[in-house]
Regions:
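Hydrophobic alpha-helical transmembrane segments of multi-pass inner membrane proteins, especially
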Residues: 22-24, 28, 45-240, 281-341, ...
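Alpha-helical transmembrane segments of multi-pass membrane proteins
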Residues: 25-40
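Membrane-helix interface and discontinuous TM-entry motifs in multi-pass inner-membrane proteins
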Residues: 157-171, 251-266
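A juxtamembrane structural motif centered on a specific transmembrane helix
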Residues: 1-13, 334-403
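Glycine/serine-rich anion-binding loops at beta->alpha junctions
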Residues: 116-126, 166-168, 256, 260, ...
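Long extracytoplasmic/lumenal interhelical loops at the membrane interface
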Residues: 256-290
């Protein structure tokens, strides 16, 4: 019976079991913590009906796992062929969002999907589109990296996509820009060209920082962070940081090593976005620093696993794609945790595959599935080689017997 269950799992969940394991673990943590963290909005809007939020979140969790399964079954080379089309579509969606998107907290980041009436951020799709397109361009011209046409194409795509995202989501644009720089460095882009792309990207980000839809908010957050750092050794540290960080510090302090127990969080009633941007302090408050360390390790595992998969990929595109997606996911997770403990300014970035989310949760699942697809690319090839060698040996034995 046990062997049959294992056979079913191996049959339908192909590829890297480590990535699958981290995804299921993060999804489980997400359901448990979000169910507790949504108490405040549940009482505010639905008379304490937390099940309404839970059901919606669980649906998105399973949708994300489903998207992960679908993308892991698609040969990763297909994304190479579609990457340029994805990029054009992403740019169009970003422009439409800036012009006609839903305005929340002074920024237009969301579009509403007709019929199902679900909001989604085109920037999530744009991140994947840019990463896959850069991986495709670098892979096809590994021997011609200094080609001027390629250089200007890469500069153009990075500047346009990062710039459009930065207008409404500066933190997300910074994260994507950093991921692209890692991808270009690993893709063996010469230092001179690398510096040109960095300067172009920083120039666009600087303009967006000052004149973007959330420019003043970004400046205010940086000022508050600097003020907090300057007063880090004084008794006035609590009053020198934003309210959300004050409550985040309290949540972490209450949690200690082992936490106050599931559902016993107090700071969830005071901490803004306790189920989203600041879900990490709630994780620690209820389950302790032990869970906080476990979550950090999981993101590092995803990053290093992505590097391992990339190093064994049969193609340059597969390797670069795995690195880009795994680094993007891990960077976002580490940045979110760094914000919660005051190491970085407040960003508004959710904790991947843990924060309550809709389509962003699904796009994260898709990214994990594509990483597994790259793993399957060389794993299936190795299996075919083993099978082919076995057939050849059997044929040789049959020839000897007949002789």
């Amino acid at each position: 019976m046990q062997k049959n269950k294992e056979h079913i799992v191996l049959k339908y969940l192909k590829g890297d079991k480590v990535i699958w394991g981290t995804a299921f673990l993060l999804a489980t943590i997400s359901i448990l913590v979000v169910y507790s963290a949504v108490s405040a909005p549940a009482f505010k809007f639905f008379g304490g009906n937390t099940e309404k939020f839970l059901i919606k979140h669980v649906i998105f969790v399973f949708a994300a796992l489903g998207a992960m399964w679908v993308t892991h079954m698609i040969p990763y080379r297909a994304y190479d062929k579609l990457s340029r089309g994805f990029l054009f579509l992403a740019i169009v969606l970003l422009i439409i969002t800036l012009a006609f998107g839903v305005d929340i907290h002074g920024a237009r980041r969301w579009l509403i999907i007709p019929i199902v009436n679900i909001q989604f951020q085109p920037s999530d799709f744009a991140k994947f589109a840019l990463i896959s397109n850069l991986a495709s361009m670098l892979a096809k011209r590994q021997g011609k990296i200094e080609d001027q046409t390629l250089i200007w194409q890469m500069i153009l795509w990075v500047v346009v996509v990062v710039g459009l995202i930065a207008v409404a989501d500066f933190s997300g644009a910074m994260l994507l820009f950093g991921t692209c720089m890692v991808l270009l460095y690993i893709g063996r882009v010469p230092l001179k060209i690398f510096a040109q792309i960095v300067m172009g990207g920083l120039a666009v980000l600087s303009v967006a920082f000052v004149f973007g839809q959330r420019g003043q908010t970004a400046i205010s957050r940086v000022d508050q962070w600097i003020n907090g750092v300057e007063n880090s050794n004084s008794a006035n540290i609590v009053n020198s940081v934003p309210d959300q960080l004050q409550y985040a510090y309290m949540a972490i302090a209450r949690g200690g090593l082992t936490g106050v127990g599931p559902g016993n969080s107090t700071m969830r009633y005071f901490l803004p976005e306790a189920f989203s941007d600041f879900v990490f302090p709630i994780c620690i408050e209820e389950y302790g620093m032990i869970l906080g360390i476990v979550i950090m390790i999981i993101y590092l595992i995803i990053m290093f696993r992505g590097m391992s998969i990339a190093s064994r990929s049969a193609t340059a595109f597969g390797g670069l794609l795995a690195i880009g997606l795994s680094f993007s996911l891990a960077f976002q997770g580490l940045v979110n945790m760094a914000v919660a403990v005051g190491v970085l300014p407040v960003t508004g970035l959710p904790l991947p595959f843990i924060s309550m989310g809709g389509t962003s949760f699904i796009f994260t699942g898709m990214s994990l599935g594509i990483i597994i697809s790259v793993y399957r690319g060389y794993s299936d090839l190795a299996d075919d080689n083993i099978e082919g060698n076995a057939i050849k040996k059997a044929e040789k034995k049959n020839v000897k017997v007949e002789q």
